[in-house]
Amino acid sequence: VKVWFQNRRTKYKRLHTDGKEILSDSNSKDQKSLSDDDEDSDGDGDDNDDDEEDDELVKRDESEDNVLIESIHQNQNNLKFENETLSKHSISESSKRINVNTFSIQNPYSFTENKQFTPSKECQQYIDHSKLNNPLGSQIINDLSEKSKISDYTKYAWNSLKQIHDNLNIDNGIERKQSSMLHSSQHLLNTVNQNLNYLQHSCR
């Protein structure tokens, strides 16, 4: 606070003196170059009067500032801080209505235990297609569909699903073997034809 008042005094004094110098410079430019000694002495007297007025203004400002600073210090000393222990968050009415037990952890399989599941359209098409192409695995498909209706599908482990998938695609495995044999025989036939062509050209 003291620094602020001191800066205010210096700024005020600087502005006041600078303004006086600017006015005196402008007046000196407008006045004639010739002047009497009496006029110079009168000017010095005016300057002395102005300096006295400036000193009085500065003293008055200083006294007012000191009174204000003293009152500020007194007010600061009179302040009393009461130690209050407040809760971090006040409990609102909406927070009181929230029941924590509403979001209890449940068994992930319990909600599907007693529900009946029906296959989707795509699943039903796959089942029908598999029945037509694999009559031997129709019983397995029926068992699987019945299990899916009364139990959760996620209970089956991946190995069991893989085994069921392999059982349903027996013909696909045979077809893969047949295509592999066909590819090998075709490759062998192409090799024989190339050798025959080579022999024919060499005999000529």
UniProtKB/Swiss-Prot annotation:
It is found in: Nucleus. Its main location: nucleus. Residues 1-15 bind DNA. Residues 15-35 have a biased composition (Basic and acidic residues). GO terms for molecular function: DNA binding. Residues 15-63 are annotated as: Disordered. Residues 36-56 have a biased composition (Acidic residues). Keywords: DNA-binding, Homeobox, Nucleus. GO terms for cellular component: nucleus. It comes from the Eukaryota. SUPFAM superfamilies: Homeodomain-like (SSF46689). The keyword Nucleus applies. CDD domains: homeodomain (cd00086). This is Homeobox protein SMOX-6. The gene is SMOX-6.
